[in-house]
C-alpha cells in the first residue's frame, strides 16, 4: 500500500508524541520539513518548543493565521498501529498529530501558490498543559507577525469524514484545573480517635463537591466538577496524614466559573473545620472559553457549504477545554470540529482517526484561505 505524503507525515509525528514544552523532536521534524520548502517568501521563527512561520503574500493587506497544537498526552497507546508511539507512556491521543500535519499541508499549498495576504502558521506547544497559547500570544516573536484573523481546528471522532461542525459564539467551555491538598494527623489504624483521617476527609470532600453543580449553578447553565485522581496513605494499617485530590472544573460562562470556585472554597473551609485539618487549593492552569467570532464563523460556514465538498453541521457548545480561547480573546477568528470517524474518543488509548480526513482538510482549507485572501 502506498500512502500519501501527508499521511506519512502524520504517521511520523504519531510515533514521537511529547508532552508540553518538551516537544523537541516534533519541533525538529517541523523545521526539517519547512526546510524542504525553501522559498524566499517564507520566514521562520522558533519560540520555545514551537514554530512560527510566515508566508509573505503578493500584495498583503491583512494577516491570516492558522494555529496547530503539537503536543501529545501521557497515555500508553493501545491502537495496534505499526507506527505506534515509540515514546513509552506517551501518545497522540487527541489528534494533534493530525492538526500539525494539516498545518504543514496548508503551508505547502501556500508556498506553492501564494495569495495576496500574508499567512502565519502557529505550531503551538503545550495545549494539553500547562498551556502554550497565551505565552505564545504574548511573545515578541508573534507580536511582529500578529494575525488579523485566526482559525484552528480540532478532530472530532464522532463526526464522519467529510464533515465539519462549528457554531457562532460559544463553542468550548471555560476550564480550570483543581488540586486540593489535605493535611491532618496520622496514627495507628486501631486508634482512630487519636488521629485525623485524611482519607475520610477526602471522601467527604468529593461527595460534597457534587452538590455545587446540582445546587449552586443555574440549571439553564452548565458546569462540571470531576475529581479524576485521589492519593493518600501509605499502608493498610496506618491512618493517612495527607491526601490529595486532582480534578477539573468546566463551565459555559465566566460567571459560573467564579461561582463554582467560590463554593469550592467554602466547602473546603468546612472540611477543614469538620476534620480539624489544613487544606490548600490550587487551580493550576485555566483556559478561557472558545468564543467564535459570529460574522467570520457564519461566513466560513457558508463558504464551506456552498463552495467545497465538505458537509457543514451546526453543533452545540461542548464542555471541552482549549487554550485557543486565549487567542480568540485577542484576535477575531473561529475554531471548528473536523470529522475523523473513530470508534474511540479523544484521550482514549485506542483513538484511531480516519486518515482520509487529512487531505480533505488540507484541500478545503486551502480553498478557504485562497478565497479569504482575496477579500478586503
Curated annotation (Swiss-Prot):
The keyword Transmembrane helix does not apply. One of its GO terms (biological process) is lysine biosynthetic process via diaminopimelate. One of its GO terms (molecular function) is N-acetyldiaminopimelate deacetylase activity. The active site is at residues 69, 128. The keyword Amino-acid biosynthesis applies. Its EC number is 3.5.1.47. It catalyses: N-acetyl-(2S,6S)-2,6-diaminopimelate + H2O = (2S,6S)-2,6-diaminopimelate + acetate. Pfam families: M20_dimer, Peptidase_M20. Keywords: Amino-acid biosynthesis, Diaminopimelate biosynthesis, Hydrolase, Lysine biosynthesis. Pathway: Amino-acid biosynthesis; L-lysine biosynthesis via DAP pathway; LL-2,6-diaminopimelate from (S)-tetrahydrodipicolinate (acetylase route): step 3/3. InterPro entries: AcetylDAP_deacetylase, Amidohydrolase, Bact_exopeptidase_dim_dom, Peptidase_M20, Peptidase_M20_dimer. It comes from the Bacteria. It is an enzyme of class 3 (hydrolase). Catalyzes the conversion of N-acetyl-diaminopimelate to diaminopimelate and acetate. Belongs to the peptidase M20A family. N-acetyldiaminopimelate deacetylase subfamily. PANTHER family: N-ACETYLDIAMINOPIMELATE DEACETYLASE, PEPTIDASE M20 FAMILY MEMBER. NCBIfam families: amidohydrolases. This is N-acetyldiaminopimelate deacetylase. It comes from Bacillus cereus (strain Q1). The lineage of its organism: Bacteria, Bacillati, Bacillota, Bacilli, Bacillales.
Amino acid at each position: 500500500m502506498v500512502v500519501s505524503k501527508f499521511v506519512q507525515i502524520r504517521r511520523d509525528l504519531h510515533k514521537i508524541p511529547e508532552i508540553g514544552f518538551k516537544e523537541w523532536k516534533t519541533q525538529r521534524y517541523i523545521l526539517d520539513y519547512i526546510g524542504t520548502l525553501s522559498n524566499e517568501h517564507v520566514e521562520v521563527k522558533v519560540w520555545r518548543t514551537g514554530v512560527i512561520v510566515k508566508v509573505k503574500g503578493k500584495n498583503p493587506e491583512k494577516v491570516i493565521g492558522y494555529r496547530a497544537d503539537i503536543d501529545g498526552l501521557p497515555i500508553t497507546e493501545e491502537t495496534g498501529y505499526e507506527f505506534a508511539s515509540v515514546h513509552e507512556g506517551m501518545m497522540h491521543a487527541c489528534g494533534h498529530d493530525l492538526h500539525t500535519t494539516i498545518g504543514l499541508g496548508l503551508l505547502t499549498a501556500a508556498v506553492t501558490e501564494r495569495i495576496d495576504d500574508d499567512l502565519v502558521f502557529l505550531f503551538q506547544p503545550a495545549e494539553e498543559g500547562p498551556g502554550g497559547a497565551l505565552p505564545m500570544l504574548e511573545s515578541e516573536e508573534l507580536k511582529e507577525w500578529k494575525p488579523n484573523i485566526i482559525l484552528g481546528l480540532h478532530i472530532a471522532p464522532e463526526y464522519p469524514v467529510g464533515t465539519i461542525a462549528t457554531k457562532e459564539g460559544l463553542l468550548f467551555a471555560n476550564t480550570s484545573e483543581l488540586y486540593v491538598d489535605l493535611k491532618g494527623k496520622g496514627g495507628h489504624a486501631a486508634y482512630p480517635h487519636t488521629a485525623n483521617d485524611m482519607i475520610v476527609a477526602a471522601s467527604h470532600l468529593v461527595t460534597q463537591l457534587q452538590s455545587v453543580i446540582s445546587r449552586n449553578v443555574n440549571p439553564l447553565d452548565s458546569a462540571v466538577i470531576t475529581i479524576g485522581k485521589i492519593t493518600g496513605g501509605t499502608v493498610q494499617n496506618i491512618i493517612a496524614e495527607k491526601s490529595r485530590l486532582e480534578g477539573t472544573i468546566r463551565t459555559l460562562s465566566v460567571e459560573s466559573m467564579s461561582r463554582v470556585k467560590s463554593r469550592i472554597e467554602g466547602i473546603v473551609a468546612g472540611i477543614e473545620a469538620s476534620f480539624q485539618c489544613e487544606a490548600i487549593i490550587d487551580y493550576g492552569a485555566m483556559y478561557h472559553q472558545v468564543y467564535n467570532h459570529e460574522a467570520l464563523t457564519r461566513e466560513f460556514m457558508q463558504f464551506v457549504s456552498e463552495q467545497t465538498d465538505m458537509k457543514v453541521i451546526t453543533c452545540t457548545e461542548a464542555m471541552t477545554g482549549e487554550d485557543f480561547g486565549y487567542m480568540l480573546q485577542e484576535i477575531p477568528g473561529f475554531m471548528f470540529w473536523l470529522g475523523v470517524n473513530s470508534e474511540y474518543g479523544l484521550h482514549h488509548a485506542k483513538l484511531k482517526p480516519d486518515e482520509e480526513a487529512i487531505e480533505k482538510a488540507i484541500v478545503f482549507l486551502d480553498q478557504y484561505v485562497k478565497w479569504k485572501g482575496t477579500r478586503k
